[in-house]
Design a protein with these regions (language model features):
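Short helix-loop-helix connector
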Residues: 38, 70, 143-147
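Central cavity-lining transmembrane alpha-helices of secondary-active solute carriers
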Residues: 45-69, 82-90, 164-170
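Transmembrane alpha-helix boundary/hinge residues in polytopic small-molecule transporters
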Residues: 25, 29, 61, 133-141
Length: 260
């Protein structure tokens, strides 16, 4: 891989790195804390954690909104930056709600606070919405920024960094929690570790997300379009329902939706 695509892949990969870390913290840590330590019914925990996946269907809408922005303006970066900020803030809120659930359940003699649980579900739905918005714009940015020959190599590095984020997320939990990761750790030490994590992780996610797109799209505008060439802007002239109907003419899209 040449130096320019490699540098681009490493920079953009930081966004996927942050999502890998987030996935470990939500699916591996918060999910376990809700079921094992707080003893929330597994069904409710699954609804809360899985709520973010329900918003994957919003990707088409966010992608359409991004494509409708004039080519002379930043089309992808605002979505990615907004997504990064929202994910960082909402993860901090999710950690605080988990802590509140614990103290509330202890104070009420084991009764689950329905309001806090409902808020936690909404927060996870918000995280899923932010991931859908940022992830769609991120994929479009890669397509805008690379040629057809470069794209497979850039994507391999970018998604490889997603896997690296999973490993780093595990390391982050071990470093922040310390002895609270032990099987016989007390609940108070686990909650103290979660409190520390709610302060450290949002800053890390925010930093990775912002650095990943810093200057990328501004450079793209000048590099990818020859002087005097105005690209066809078909998505600006078609409504979202019309674009979705066009998917029916693509055999691969039909098979993919059938699998879903």
């Amino acid at each position: 891989m040449h130096s320019r695509p490699l540098r681009l892949a490493m920079q953009l990969g930081l966004f996927q790195l942050s999502l890998g870390i987030l996935g470990v913290l939500i699916l591996g840590l918060l999910n376990r804390l809700l079921i094992q330590d707080i003893q929330v019914p597994a069904v409710l925990a699954a609804v809360a954690v899985g709520g973010q996946q329900l918003m994957g269907f919003a990707r088409a809408w966010f992608g359409h909104r991004s494509d409708r922005i004039p080519i002379s303006r930043l089309r992808r970066t605002p979505f990615i930056v907004s997504s990064t900020v929202a994910i960082a803030l909402l993860f901090c809120v999710a950690c605080q709600l988990v802590l509140r659930l614990t103290t509330s359940k202890e104070a009420s003699g084991g009764e689950l606070n329905g309001l806090l649980m409902g808020l936690l579900i909404l927060v996870f739905v918000g995280i899923g919405t932010a991931i859908a918005a940022g992830g769609t714009a991120f994929s479009a940015l890669i397509a805008d920024r690379t040629t057809e020959a470069e794209r497979p190599r850039v994507l391999s590095v970018v998604w490889g960094m997603r896997l690296l984020g999973v490993l780093l997320g595990s390391v982050l939990v071990n470093q922040v929690f310390g002895s609270a990761c032990a099987a016989d750790a007390s609940r108070s030490s686990v909650l103290a570790g979660l409190e520390r994590l709610s302060l450290v992780t949002p800053l890390l996610l925010l930093g990775l997300g912002l650095v990943s797109v810093f200057g990328v799209e501004r450079r793209t505008t000048g590099l990818m379009l020859p002087a005097g060439l105005v690209p066809p802007d078909v998505p600006q002239r078609l409504a979202l329902p019309q674009l979705l109907l066009q998917l029916r003419t693509i055999p691969q899209a039909g098979r993919f939706l059938g699998v879903l």
